[in-house]
UniProtKB/Swiss-Prot annotation:
It is an enzyme of class 2 (transferase). GO terms for molecular function: ATP binding; thymidine kinase activity; zinc ion binding. This is Thymidine kinase. The active site is at E89 (proton acceptor). Pfam families: TK (PF00265). The gene is tdk. Zn(2+) binds at C146, C148, C183, H186. Its EC number is 2.7.1.21. It comes from Legionella pneumophila (strain Paris). It is found in: Cytoplasm.
Length: 209
């Protein structure tokens, strides 16, 4: 029986990386996958899911008015049966679109894997995450860490000076320059800690073996 899965985490936990790996695992075995990404996410090339470690894959960029159930039916008529549907940045789904994902699972018997944030920078649920938490068959937490080494569960919005921002619109598209994942304690204190440039993370000179 197909299920709806919600993989949730704080920022920079590798959600898109896990999504792309899952899609690759299906395709490696000759199975078709359908990937969706929200058109509102303008961090990368339009209609592309990109991970922080450099993996990328084309996806259908959807808007809030799109019916994901109908789109999946239409796309499947053009290709062989999909073995899995994968959703990136699922926190941006509407209530209706989360219901449509349950229809893909229940009526079309296709597993749906949705990946997204649980809460915004104020510690409040996104609409998409709220209904995924309520309706998904399986909830899986992807873990990342705070600068102190504890598990990070909060998403802190920061300004250009690295200071915590506590007011503003719920949606502000950004990456490491706008958000940092922290534990609850450092979220309360407004302490973002320090992040490192990507080239420092992959510097071969830092490896001693």
């Amino acid at each position: 029986m197909a299920k709806l899965y919600f993989y949730y985490a704080a920022m920079n936990a590798g959600k898109s990386t896990v999504l792309l790996q899952s899609s690759y695992n299906y395709r490696e075995r000759g199975m078709q996958t359908l990937l969706f990404t929200p058109a509102i996410d303008t961090r990368f090339q339009y209609g592309t899911i990109c991970s922080r470690i450099g993996l990328s894959e084309q996806a259908y960029a959807f808007n809030n008015s799109d019916n994901l159930y109908v789109l999946t039916q239409e796309f499947q008529l053009q290709t062989q049966k999909y073995s899995c549907v994968l959703i990136d940045e699922a926190q941006f789904l509407t209530r209706e679109q989360v219901y449509q994902l349950t229809e893909i699972t229940d009526q079309m018997s296709i597993p749906v894997l949705a990946y997204g944030l649980r809460t915004d920078f104020r510690g409040e649920l996104f609409p998409g995450s709220q209904f995924l938490l309520a309706w998904a068959d399986e909830l899986i937490e992807l873990k990342t860490i705070c600068h102190c080494g504890r598990k990070a569960i909060m998403n802190m919005r920061i300004d250009e000076n690295g200071q915590a921002v506590i007011e503003g619109e719920q949606v502000l598209i950004g990456g490491n320059e706008s958000y940092v994942a922290t534990c609850r304690l450092h979220y309360k204190r407004g302490e973002a800690g320090k992040t490192f440039p990507r080239n420092k993370l992959f510097n071969k000179d830092t490896n001693t073996f």
